[in-house]
């Protein structure tokens, strides 16, 4: 969430920057938060004054008892009882005001970075660069048809077992998922990421920490009081919640391959066929926890790490900077990597790399000691490295020659050095 003191001191600027998101007008919510924060400060001043008076009286009572001034000490005790009642009442008022502030803040998104492109939707995103790779085979068969023809995926049985937007990888399809995940994790390990094998179920505080809750609750799968992860960004970023890290341990870089789960509540009618939009999907995630002054440089390196995956497979792709109206809730700045799908004749997102600045860190209370031993919030970044199902779909469409799937060279050792699947 945002820093309430920054909001209070820079209200007009915060309103202006948030309104660039083109999602809603946050003016009333922000003014409400500021007014409640002033109320909170008033309560704290009153409470501290009462506590100070109570402490003073407690000392006086001891002195009065020593001097055997019983009547005066009894009067002081009565005043202490009254003060306690007032303090309890103020504490309850403070709890209510804090809850009111938190309830609003948790629904207010991160500030877009000051140099971000202004735009209303994904149509206003800006292409930064394209790869030099091209679709060599020039065939345009839908990936789901190729997957079915080769027996790599059973879409019908996925629906039979679990419903729409579920699938089953079979035979060489299962091996394809496993080999790609292994390949990606090894690559990211070489780039300094530490592999984590993390839980697929997390508690509510973890979801609050990264900003999935409360705003996106309808998109989450809930298991009792816990949640299936929508991405391993959630457990990886929360690894250091409520911790104060030493200066020299940063940056921390984590990677994980997991299944991810999303309701896709707002995606009715979109990508109903194939492997692009699933309720359960496979992804290799990249997370960084860094010094604030290094976060923008770390974002550029994060993009390069994700690009490296697509370059490994010689897939055509482009890098797009998201405009102010398209960035995610917790993000200050985001770049998408989009891979070419010849059958659709367009680029589709396969990785999203974001700098969340101190937005998530404030929720999680993940801090570090700077060189002067001052406690500060870290910055957090995350990116797909990459979405495995979408990568497989892109390989199917870009490496299909009309009769067989040409296996990318670096995958062949996993398939007994065979050159194609037919």
Curated annotation (Swiss-Prot):
Gene3D superfamilies with a match to the protein in the record: Bira Bifunctional Protein, Domain 2, Serine-tRNA synthetase, tRNA binding domain
Pathway: Aminoacyl-tRNA biosynthesis; selenocysteinyl-tRNA(Sec) biosynthesis; L-seryl-tRNA(Sec) from L-serine and tRNA(Sec): step 1/1
GO biological process, one term: selenocysteine biosynthetic process
One Gene Ontology cellular component: cytoplasm
InterPro entries with a match to the protein in the record: aa-tRNA-synt_IIb (IPR002314), aa-tRNA-synth_II (IPR006195), aa-tRNA-synth_II/BPL/LPL (IPR045864), Ser-tRNA-ligase_type_1 (IPR002317), Ser-tRNA-synth_1_N (IPR015866), SerRS_1_N_sf (IPR042103), SerRS_core (IPR033729), tRNA-bd_arm (IPR010978)
E.C. number: 6.1.1.11
Database matches in Pfam families: Seryl_tRNA_N (PF02403), tRNA-synt_2b (PF00587)
Origin superkingdom: Bacteria
Endpoints of the signal sequence: none
Keyword Aminoacyl-tRNA synthetase: yes
Ligand binding (ATP): 262-264, 349-352
Reaction equations catalysed: tRNA(Ser) + L-serine + ATP = L-seryl-tRNA(Ser) + AMP + diphosphate + H(+); tRNA(Sec) + L-serine + ATP = L-seryl-tRNA(Sec) + AMP + diphosphate + H(+)
PROSITE patterns the UniProt entry points to: AA_TRNA_LIGASE_II
Binding site for L-serine: 231-233, 285, 384
Subunit note: Homodimer. The tRNA molecule binds across the dimer.
PANTHER family associated with the record: SERINE--TRNA LIGASE, SERYL-TRNA SYNTHETASE
Domain notes: Consists of two distinct domains, a catalytic core and a N-terminal extension that is involved in tRNA binding.
Function: Catalyzes the attachment of serine to tRNA(Ser). Is also able to aminoacylate tRNA(Sec) with serine, to form the misacylated tRNA L-seryl-tRNA(Sec), which will be further converted into selenocysteinyl-tRNA(Sec).
Similarity remark: Belongs to the class-II aminoacyl-tRNA synthetase family. Type-1 seryl-tRNA synthetase subfamily.
Protein name: Serine--tRNA ligase
Naturally occurring in which organism (per UniProt): Mycoplasma capricolum subsp. capricolum (strain California kid / ATCC 27343 / NCTC 10154)
């Amino acid at each position: 969430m945002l820093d309430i003191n920054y909001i209070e001191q820079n209200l007009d600027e915060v309103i202006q920057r948030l309104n660039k998101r083109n999602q809603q007008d946050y003016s009333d919510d922000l003014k409400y938060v500021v007014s409640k924060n002033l109320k909170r400060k008033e309560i704290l001043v009153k409470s501290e004054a009462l506590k100070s008076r109570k402490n003073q009286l407690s000392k006086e009572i001891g002195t009065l008892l020593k001097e055997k001034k019983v009547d005066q000490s009894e009067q002081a005790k009565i005043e202490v009882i009254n003060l306690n009642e007032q303090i309890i009442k103020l504490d309850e008022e403070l709890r209510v005001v804090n809850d009111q502030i938190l309830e609003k803040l948790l629904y207010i998104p991160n500030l877009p970075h000051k140099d971000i492109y202004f735009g209303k939707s994904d149509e206003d995103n800006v292409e930064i660069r394209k790869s030099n790779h091209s679709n060599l085979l020039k065939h345009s068969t839908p990936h789901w048809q190729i997957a079915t023809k080769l027996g790599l995926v059973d879409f019908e049985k996925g629906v039979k077992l679990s419903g729409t937007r579920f699938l089953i990888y079979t035979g060489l399809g299962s091996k394809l998922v496993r080999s790609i995940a292994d390949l990606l994790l090894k690559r990211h390990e070489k780039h300094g990421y530490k592999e984590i094998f993390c839980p697929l179920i997390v508690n509510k505080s973890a979801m609050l920490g990264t900003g999935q809750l409360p705003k996106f609750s309808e998109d989450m799968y809930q298991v009792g009081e816990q949640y299936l992860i929508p991405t391993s960004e959630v457990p990886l970023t929360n690894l250091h919640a409520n911790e104060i890290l030493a200066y020299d341990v940063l940056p921390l870089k984590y990677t994980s391959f997991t299944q991810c789960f999303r309701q896709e509540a707002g995606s009715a009618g979109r990508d109903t066929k194939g492997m692009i939009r699933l309720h359960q999907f496979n992804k290799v995630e990249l997370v960084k926890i860094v010094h604030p002054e290094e976060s923008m440089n770390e974002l550029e390196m994060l993009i390069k790490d994700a690009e490296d995956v697509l370059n490994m497979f010689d897939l055509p792709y482009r890098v797009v900077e998201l405009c102010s109206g398209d960035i995610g809730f917790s993000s200050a700045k985001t770049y998408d990597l989009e891979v070419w799908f010849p059958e659709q004749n367009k680029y589709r997102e396969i990785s999203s790399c974001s700098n969340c600045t101190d937005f998530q860190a404030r929720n999680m209370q993940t801090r570090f000691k700077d060189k002067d031993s001052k406690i500060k919030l870290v910055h957090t970044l995350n990116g797909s490295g990459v979405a495995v199902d979408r990568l497989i779909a892109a390989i199917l469409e870009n490496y299909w020659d009309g009769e067989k799937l040409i296996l990318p060279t670096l995958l062949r050792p996993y398939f007994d050095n065979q050159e194609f699947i037919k």
